[in-house]
Design a protein with these regions (language model features):
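Cellulosome-associated attachment modules in secreted, modular CAZymes
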Residues: 1-158
Length: 158
């Protein structure tokens, strides 16, 4: 659980939107009254009304943000133009320390390309980050034919 405090915001009804570095954002379906008293919004609870269809990955009573938006264009794309997969590969191939231009090269740092959040950016091999992207695209409820070129768009912005 994390708390956010808005000291200067006037009491009113606001949409609450949550975003994390390489995830599609999620927002409340309706404005939430924010004022002097604490207001609790639990985006991890699948019964919390959110804006849009399939705005989050749902597993029983829990929900999570869709991960894989490396280039932060509000879409998960594994194949084709502006693909997040290509963004991961380009980051690794262009790294100054990757002298052999290996797709198995690893970068250890906090980065939007670290989709599995293990602190390592990896394109190919065990525990790679591209599997997270492909998994979220192939298993997305709207991708009824499990196409790898399916695009998952951020519901909060539609």
């Amino acid at each position: 659980q994390s708390s956010l405090i808005f000291n200067a915001a006037p009491a009113a009804a606001y949409y609450v939107r949550l975003w994390h570095r390489n995830h599609l954002s999620i927002r409340t379906a309706k404005p939430i009254n924010l004022g002097v008293d604490a207001t609790f919004v639990d985006f991890s609870n699948s019964s919390t009304p959110t804006y849009g269809t399939h705005a989050a990955y749902v597993e029983g009573t829990l929900q999570a943000l869709w991960a894989g938006d490396v280039n932060q264009d509000a879409a998960l794309i594994a194949e084709g133009n502006n693909s997040d997969r290509t963004s991961i590969l380009a980051l690794l191939l262009m790294d100054a320390n990757n002298e052999s231009a290996s797709s198995n090269f690893q970068i250890q740092r906090y980065d939007a390309a670290d989709l599995n959040l293990d602190g390592i950016v990896l394109y190919a091999g065990p525990n790679n980050d591209t599997n997270v992207l492909f998994g979220n695209i192939l298993l997305h409820p709207a991708n009824v034919y499990a196409n790898s070129n399916f695009i998952v768009r951020e519901a909060a912005l539609q």
